């Protein structure tokens, strides 16, 4: 299941949420950092607290490379990394009441209105935190944007699930990030908020339970012309959507698909279509490794329906 010594591929695990005691080989407190950057902060935390286990989320490949070099240098055994949007990962990979602390250090503030759902002040993300944090577990949020700090403060203070223990300007911490040191050296203001969970929340997960393999077996007269007609076609159903971006032919057929699930979680993957004598199998291509979300599974059902529909455009 471990792709490198530190990187996990949760999409290949048999059940969701994950059993972190099995992954680390022990039962220990779990600490999460969202957006670990070059890994400096996470590495130092893991080094200072060998009794705890640490999980970092990032989407940058460069960050993964830099972070793992640091972990290897310290010979750390208590840290794992996941390359996925943390809004999805925190909700889907951790059971309720399983995380002791979440660090969010100097995230992008997403100032534009159309991006506000990406902020930690969004309702969905707050619900996730209220579910996965253990009782009295904390969120530690640091930023150099005062308006963002005030917005986060207001969000936690108005929540029934949290109380704010700390709101501090120009704070000092034992472990600092690169940006923290940079802003302080430039005399720029920094802000720290620590919110503590006081009430259990609930969250709707997309992938709870067994992580089953996805494929479709069907019969019909599938032609290259029918497949090409799928290109650019958008399929919508309630809280999920997908589009067939491109169809390729090289022996079998290959379909490039982009899907979006409830909450805005987007994936790009390839489906392999192979068949003989009117019998077909549509499955994930071996080169694709997405999460088996409702939108992905629906694309595997809906595409055969479209290809075999009588009189379909």
Curated annotation (Swiss-Prot):
One of its GO terms (biological process) is tRNA methylation. The keyword Isomerase does not apply. GO terms for molecular function: tRNA (guanine(46)-N7)-methyltransferase activity. It is an enzyme of class 2 (transferase). Its EC number is 2.1.1.33. GO terms for cellular component: tRNA methyltransferase complex. The gene is trmB. The lineage of its organism: Bacteria, Thermotogati, Thermotogota, Thermotogae, Thermotogales. It comes from Thermotoga maritima (strain ATCC 43589 / DSM 3109 / JCM 10099 / NBRC 100826 / MSB8). The keyword tRNA processing applies. It catalyses: guanosine(46) in tRNA + S-adenosyl-L-methionine = N(7)-methylguanosine(46) in tRNA + S-adenosyl-L-homocysteine. It comes from the Bacteria. This is tRNA (guanine-N(7)-)-methyltransferase. Catalyzes the formation of N(7)-methylguanine at position 46 (m7G46) in tRNA. S-adenosyl-L-methionine binds at residues 33, 58, 85. Gene3D superfamilies: Vaccinia Virus protein VP39. Keywords: Methyltransferase, S-adenosyl-L-methionine, Transferase, tRNA processing. Belongs to the class I-like SAM-binding methyltransferase superfamily. TrmB family. Substrate binds at residues 112, 144, 177-180. Pathway: tRNA modification; N(7)-methylguanine-tRNA biosynthesis. InterPro entries: SAM-dependent_MTases_sf, tRNA_(Gua-N-7)_MeTrfase_Trmb, tRNA_methyltr_TrmB_bact.
């Amino acid at each position: 299941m471990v792709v490198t010594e530190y990187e996990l591929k949760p999409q290949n695990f048999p059940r969701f949420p994950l059993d972190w005691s099995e992954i680390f080989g022990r039962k220990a407190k779990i600490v999460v950092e969202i957006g670990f950057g070059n890994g400096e902060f996470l590495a130092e935390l893991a080094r200072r607290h060998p009794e705890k286990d640490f999980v970092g989320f990032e989407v940058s490949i460069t960050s993964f490379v830099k972070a793992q070099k640091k972990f290897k240098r310290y010979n750390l055994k208590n840290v794992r990394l996941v390359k996925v949007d943390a809004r999805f990962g925190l909700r889907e990979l951790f059971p309720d009441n399983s995380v002791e602390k979440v660090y969010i250090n100097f995230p992008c503030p997403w100032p534009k209105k159309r991006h506000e759902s990406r902020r930690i002040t969004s309702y969905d993300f707050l619900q996730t935190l209220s579910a996965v944090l253990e009782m009295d577990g904390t969120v530690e949020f640091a930023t150099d944007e005062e308006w963002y700090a005030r917005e986060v403060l207001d969000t936690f203070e108005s929540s029934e699930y949290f109380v704010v223990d700390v709101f501090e300007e120009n704070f000092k911490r034992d472990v600092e990030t690169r940006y923290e040191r940079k802003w302080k050296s430039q005399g720029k203001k920094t802000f720290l908020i620590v919110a503590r969970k006081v009430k259990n929340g609930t969250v709707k997960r997309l992938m709870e339970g067994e992580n089953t393999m996805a494929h479709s077996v069907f019969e019909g007269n599938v032609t290259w012309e029918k497949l090409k007609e799928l290109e650019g076609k958008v399929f919508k159903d309630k809280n999920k959507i997908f589009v067939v971006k491109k169809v390729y032919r090289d022996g079998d057929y290959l379909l490039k698909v982009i899907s979006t699930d409830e909450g805005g979680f987007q994936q790009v993957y390839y489906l392999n279509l192979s068949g003989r004598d009117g019998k077909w199998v549509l499955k994930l291509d071996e080169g694709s490794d997405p999460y088996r979300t409702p939108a992905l599974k629906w694309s595997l059902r809906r595409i055969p329906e479209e290809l075999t529909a009588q009189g379909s455009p």
